[in-house]
C-alpha cells in the first residue's frame, strides 16, 4: 500500500492546491488522538499520515510514523466534524459511509449538512476495486441529489413539479395504470407513483444508474426499448405515457 500511494500521490501538487485537507488518526504508542490539517503534515510524510488515518492491522501490525504505531482515527471519532468547527468553518457537508448518527458540537451559526447512504455499503473488510468504485459513485451522486434536490430513490432525476406528472397520462388511461401497476404501498402523489414505476422499468432494462436524467429524454429512450419488448409487464405503462418537454 505504501508503494502504491507513493507512486500515485503527487505531494507537491497536493500542497500547491488552494483546497485545505484535514484528517485524524490515533497514536497507539502514545495513546492519544491526532488531528492535522495540510499545514501540519511534515514535508515528505503525506503517505505515512494517509496510511495512519485508515490503518486497520488485521493482517500485519507495523510502525508507520516516526517509529510509532497508529490506527484508523475512527476508533475515537468516525466523523471528525469538531476539528472543522474549531478551525472556523461555518458550513460543513458530511458525506457518511455508515448509517449511525454522528456526534458533534452544536454551535450557533454553524450549519451542518448530513448526507448519508440510502443503502447498506457492506463490510469495511470488503476491499474489491469494484466495490470501492461503486461506493465512490454512490457518495458522489447522493451528494448531487442533496445539493440539486434531485428526484428518485435508486436513480437520479431532474426535479419536476407535481403538476408536470399529472400531464403524463390521460385521466382515463391513468386509472387503468394505477389499477395495473400500483400493487404495493399506496403512493402519496402521482409523482411518487410514476417515478417509482419508472425506476422499476429502468432496472428491468438495465439503464445506467449513476447519471442525472431529464425525464423527457429518458422516456424517449424507454419507449424505443419497449417497442422490441412487448412482453414486458411495463409495456402498457410506457406505451401510454406522454413525453412532455418543459
List each language-model region with its residue ranges.
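Patatin-like phospholipase
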Residues: 1-246
